[in-house]
């Protein structure tokens, strides 16, 4: 069980890195830079550790 959680944590971390990199290096949509900055700030707040993630949707708000 712990191995599968560690594997999912790794995948979530890689996915967050890819999203952040794509948003930081995006020059095609430079018109919406403010939205990109907001998205990057929100991604920085995400904890990719599944063990500390909220269990229900009400905790996400």
Swiss-Prot record:
It comes from the Viruses. InterPro entries: DUF816. Pfam families: DUF816. This is Uncharacterized 7.1 kDa protein in HE65-PK2 intergenic region. It comes from Autographa californica nuclear polyhedrosis virus (AcMNPV).
């Amino acid at each position: 069980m712990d191995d599968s959680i560690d594997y999912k944590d790794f995948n979530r971390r890689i996915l967050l890195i890819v999203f952040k990199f794509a948003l930081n290096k995006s020059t095609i949509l430079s018109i919406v830079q403010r939205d990109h900055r907001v998205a990057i700030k929100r991604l920085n707040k995400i904890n990719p550790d599944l063990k500390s993630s909220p269990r229900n949707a009400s905790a996400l708000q």
